[in-house]
Amino acid sequence: MRTVLCFEECLSLAFILLGLRHVERTCPHCKGERTKAHGRYQRLSDGARVARLRCLNCRRTFSKATYDVCFAQKKRHVNHPLWMLLVSGVSLRRVSKILRISRTTSARKLLFLGRVAKRELKESLLHKAKLECVEFDDMETFEHSKCKPLSISLAVESGTRRILGFEVSQMPANGPLAKIAKQRYGRRPDQRLIGRKRLLRFVRKLSKRNVVIKSDENPHYPPLIRGIFPRGEHLRYKGRRGCVVGQGELKRGGFDPLFSLNHTAAMFRANVNRLF
């Protein structure tokens, strides 16, 4: 007897529990609910037998796989191993070699899994209790060159380390690379404020009115947080040096008031290849 669920079954179960899945017997063409069985067919990608249905209103046919999150995918069997490899520090190129698929397929699967995860995260957060304490900060990385830096605005629930959301924004290079970056790539827009606002406005939907927001002493945070959380309390903590060179999320010694956020950021850097 099979007791282990495949990746698609886990996704389907999650969507059912979250109330996101459509009724399988509803016609996708006319939205009619009067349907009858119309045989079965064997799916080429994994050999599964899928039931077909005929709508009694428009007389058109569809299958129970129409509303599946993996609908029309021909390599659904690589979804789970690809997901496990990508969150284990493996690059897209190496994933393609390990699974013997093209880099284009890996990139498309990454986008698909990202959409599913983001949708599931948002729906699960909306059904949780209102937040009382949130930790918020930015971490930095870059695209293909350090002359093109990126800012990742991250918010987590204090104590539980539950990720509430993040936004990736372009930012101009600073320090010794600022002049070189401008010569090579021109002026780079600073979109950090837009990303922070988008993230904090989403967090506001999940939080109590008197929520506590913890952050470091970045001078750009207070006016932004006051505007979005007028009744909230903003606690600021002085930043400290990292305990390892190049890994600023892991703080040196003693009590860390932003441990939930810093630990989450450190896990990102340890398990996502592009953040190494």
Residue ranges and their predicted role:
Residues 2-276:
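Residue-level recognition of single "structural anchor" positions
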